Amino acid sequence: MHNQYGSIFSITTWGESHGPAIGVVIDGCPAGLSLSPEDFLPAMARRRPGQLHTSPRQEPDLVTILSGVYQNKTTGTPISLLIENKDVSSSSYEQLQHCYRPGHAQFAYEGKYGFADNRGGGRASARETASRVAAGVIAKKILLSQRIETLAFLSGFGTLESKNYPKLSDSLIQQVHTSPFYTLLPQEEIQNLLLLNPDDSFGGVVSFITSPLPIGLGEPVFGKLPALLAAAMMSIPAAKGFEIGAGFSSSQMTGSAYLDAFIADESGVSLQSNRCGGALGGISIGQPLEGRVAFKPTSSIKKPCSSVLKDGTLIAYRTPNQGRHDPCVAIRAVAVVEAMLDLTLVDLLLQHRCTQL
């Protein structure tokens, strides 16, 4: 299994949804970075379950630093982080051992490995993403030391959607972080959709933006910045689509409508618009990075659907009432998208340092 992401700055996540713990090992973090357990609290709180309109599973998601940090400073050696699973309830999954859960990875895992841990999705569960968010905290610290800021936010919920990319600012970050849905969309409309559809789930879109990036992040051909971001984002559970800049809408434009004209002033050369999303030839060009990730509706819903037992018998399937699931995974995916953005950018930043003497 591919459990590692990154080249110079890399992470390896481990653990299952209903195991005793999950965690991550980070390689390539420079020495001397300030780091304490308290640094993880805000980001982990944005991803953790048990909050409004998310899975009722109660996980404190406190991060324990096992290695790579001494006297609150990174040492340059591998950093190992542990997150205990405190609220594991596997009983609701016992009745599912003999049938396939529609929309879940169990069927694929059994086909590939001949065996699967079906408790809460096992390794395929979104629980794994808590490890990515923890690693992303370290990546964000490195980016901030280089004056690079990033933000992800919910830009689509069901039929509600905004395709605008706002300019990143402290006030925007504060607005997103204080929203219960981490969004700029009308919160009352989201709440109404949830209240009117208590037995169903919703898809969503998470947008990400950055401050202007340094020129040169990304490599030609197979190491392009958008390509690496696409791989990072599409590795998130339930992600079903990715675009950068104008994305799919650019296929409906003419060349004259799409082109970003170059302009120049006393600060240098820049673009009049940013439909390219901040990269040309797969390399950052000093513009903000802008993109979006689409997430499917949660597969675990209260409405019945058809499935089969492992012996092929057709059955009417209903998610167990005691199961604990998100009505919209995109809400908590905001923190995960931001973490994967940060991890990708730090890795490319360190790679770029190797391109010139």
From Swiss-Prot:
EC number: 4.2.3.5
Pathway as given in its UniProt record: Metabolic intermediate biosynthesis; chorismate biosynthesis; chorismate from D-erythrose 4-phosphate and phosphoenolpyruvate: step 7/7
GO molecular function: chorismate synthase activity; FMN binding
Keyword Amino-acid biosynthesis: yes
Reaction(s) this enzyme catalyzes, per UniProt: 5-O-(1-carboxyvinyl)-3-phosphoshikimate = chorismate + phosphate
Membership in a protein family: Belongs to the chorismate synthase family.
Record text on subunit structure and interactions: Homotetramer.
Transmembrane segments: none
Any single Gene Ontology cellular-component annotation: cytosol
Organism: Chlamydia trachomatis serovar D (strain ATCC VR-885 / DSM 19411 / UW-3/Cx)
Superkingdom of the source species: Bacteria
Binding positions for NADP(+) per the UniProt entry: 47
Protein name: Chorismate synthase
One annotated GO biological process: aromatic amino acid family biosynthetic process
Positions that bind FMN: 123-125, 281, 296-300, 324
Cofactors required: FMNH2
Cofactor-binding details, from the entry: Reduced FMN (FMNH(2)).
UniProt keyword list: Amino-acid biosynthesis, Aromatic amino acid biosynthesis, FAD, Flavoprotein, FMN, Lyase, NADP
One Pfam family of this chain: Chorismate_synt
Role description: This reaction introduces a second double bond into the aromatic ring system.
